[in-house]
Amino acid sequence: MAREQALTPMMAQYRQIKSQYPDCILFFRLGDFYEMFYEDAEVAARELDLVLTTRGGKEAAPMCGVPFHAADSYLARLVGKGYKVAICEQMEDPRQAKGLVRREVIRVVTPGTITDEKALTPGGNNYLAAIVRYNGCWGLAWADASTGEFLFTTCPDQETLVDELVRLMPSEYLLPGELARDTALKRLLQIYTRGVITGWQVASNPEAARQSLEDHFGHEALAGVELPAAAGLAAAMILSFLVATQHNSLAHLEAPAAAATTSRMFLDQATRRNLELVTAGREQKREGSLLWVLDKTLTAMGARTLRRWLDQPLVDAGAIKERQEAVAELVEGFILRQELRERLQVVRDLERLAGRVAYGTAGGRELQALRGSLAVIPGILELMSEVHSRLLAQVRAQLDPLDDLVDLLGRALVDDPPASITEGGIIRTGYNGEVDKLREAATHGRDWIASLEAEERERTGIKSLKVGYNRVFGYYIEVTRPNLPQVPADYERKQTLANAERFVTRRLQELERQVLGAEERLVQLEYELFQGLREEVLGVLPRIQATARALGVLDALISLATVAVDNNYTCPRVDDGTVIEIEQGRHPVVELVGSPGTFVPNDTYLDQEQYIQIITGPNMAGKSTYIRQVALIVLLAQIGSFVPARRAHIGLVDRIFTRVGAADDIFAGQSTFMVEMQEVAGILKHATRRSLVILDEVGRGTSTADGLSIARAVTEYIHNVIGARCLFATHYHELVSLAEELSGVRNYCVAVLEEGEDITFLRTIVPGSTDKSYGIHVARLAGLPEQVLERAREILEQQPRAQVRVLTKPVKKPTLTPGEVQVLEELAGYNLMAATPLEAMEQIFRWQKMLHKELDIVKRSRG
């Protein structure tokens, strides 16, 4: 950087402000641009594809800039890449400043605090999370700075913490010093989530944390809140970070509340991923997920509400019934549903609009969008005047039309406000008498100046004479050079151009003062009036937020009803029993992506007498689709949705566990078998009698003997110890004997039609078992050459069924190094069931490092 003594006053000001925000890119307001200097300029130029220039003389400073009116898009790009940006504004009008313009940082934008709608996912959340460990307990708090949502919870172990974080997918984590230095934790966060990590100071003790929260929200707001020590420390971190970065009152931020845990089903990361609840496939696309099927919402609030319901299904039969009754009323009320959808189409994101008001960044267009959204509430209330379901009646009671605010904004704002609030044209004529007078004076003044041009042409005889204006010289009279001899004596020369001269007269200057003075006062008055309007909105933010939440619930209910009608779903019976009975159940996603009418439905029956199904059958026959569809139907029932079945009776499930093949490549550097065993270990550790367990091909990642042994032992443990309802799809035909040994086990298989060599998978699950794999048939479906298929048949016929071998030459026994032997011995003795995922992962990393070292030794010895 330049030497201090060589800096101009403005650059010295820049240096002083930048020193307070060393970890941020500083957007430094200069007129109509945000400028960046030195290292910030080099980073911004590279990341934003800007032209890098220089400022200054001998020790020039690299610089680049972006127009202030387009800054949001550039800001979003930087924050999206993980940078923090400090916004430094001019705090006074440069024309009125005495000396250097006063500048201050008005907010710091980070990945977890960005509020611009264009930079955020519509219908999604952008969470800032704080993690604290206190007395062996994990405290977790999270807030959406754009909507005001603020929640906390505690986690008994790191595994549960990671599961919560995968559900929330925060954009930014706040970690206190010791955790910010915890490389293992940071590695976990990087593997499982996408958020950036920010070190932040934690309160000295839980009492100080609670006091800071009460100082901000008030004692009454937290009077009934039970705030565990670790969670309180995390919540206080969130608040202190927002206060430090946003530089405002955070009026829209709700008092922290405990996240519902006992009344909601907890879904771990494996289940969410394996059932493809919100994303699908290796590319993690929304299309093909359950949310893709269910989300017919029309508002951002509705989309967020539906996503929350899907993330946390209910475990209370009464609450489920309330949602079902509301959905049923909307299913039956076609006209009501359609007319409500029409009203909701024009509703903008009220939660984020409220947030922008709180941050002081809402302009005329945002307030007009707020007014337009609230204006539909009376019509919605009228449509819902006769609803009878309890939940819809609650929604209606919570909808506040805010007539007073809608009327005020309608009278005050023009229909199409300009983007800027500092250039006038935002206040409607008739709202304020002084505005009307100034606007008339400015308009008449401009008319007088326009008429002056005709008068001067007449007086001077110069037909090409014209009156113009620019910001530097103001109004002027321009005369071309050939006509200069005709210029009157009262013309005062102002500027000389190549082909013309510019003049002023006393009359023109007087009119200019009148016009510009009126315009300047008008712009200032409109700005002040607009600030007053924003304050009025600020005063009713809680009412707006309550209405936004109610609209979100209504929209989500309508979405579920729309899907139920469009896809022929039925209302399930949900109770506290243990029965899962599904008649003609269908997979909600697969039935939509395939050809219409081709999906084969299946029945399911589980109860306390027969609670484990062993399902055998060939690959590609439909086993995996069947077991997943049962899990999805149960989940849909417990969010209060109708389900894809002819009839369904669901005994409440406290958790759904899955081990299916979709996760085989999810952990870089880990084998299929290790991933599989970790997921199975988690299931055996956490499942209860009320759980639903979905297992697909357990044990396939190791030898046949080991895999079969593990699969059998796992099934016995679920049957004898846990007692959970379980669907187990397997290629181990030997497991069917368990039905004769364990009273709760039943065998099912996929029906197959054989006609000579032609085989058809009927995709129907029927009682019984099969000992055929139809592997060669599947190979034909996959496109293997006929020559290969024929050779496979010959080999199969020559070998005993259970001892197929194709190797004809003895294999030389490999020679192991001492280090490799050590790894094998440690692996053989490792207690996988007692290890947490983090401990297992760390152990694998250590073994991998040892093997790399041994490999290097072998290579050097051969070299």
Curated annotation (Swiss-Prot):
One of its GO terms (biological process) is mismatch repair. This protein is involved in the repair of mismatches in DNA. It is possible that it carries out the mismatch recognition step. This protein has a weak ATPase activity. Belongs to the DNA mismatch repair MutS family. One of its GO terms (molecular function) is ATP binding. The keyword Repeat does not apply. This is DNA mismatch repair protein MutS. InterPro entries: DNA_mismatch_repair_MutS, DNA_mismatch_repair_MutS-lik_N, DNA_mismatch_repair_MutS/MSH, DNA_mismatch_repair_MutS_C, DNA_mismatch_repair_MutS_clamp, DNA_mismatch_repair_MutS_core, DNA_mismatch_repair_MutS_N, DNA_mismatch_repair_MutS_sf. SMART domains: MUTSac, MUTSd. GO terms for cellular component: cytosol. Keywords: ATP-binding, DNA damage, DNA repair, DNA-binding, Nucleotide-binding. It comes from the Bacteria.
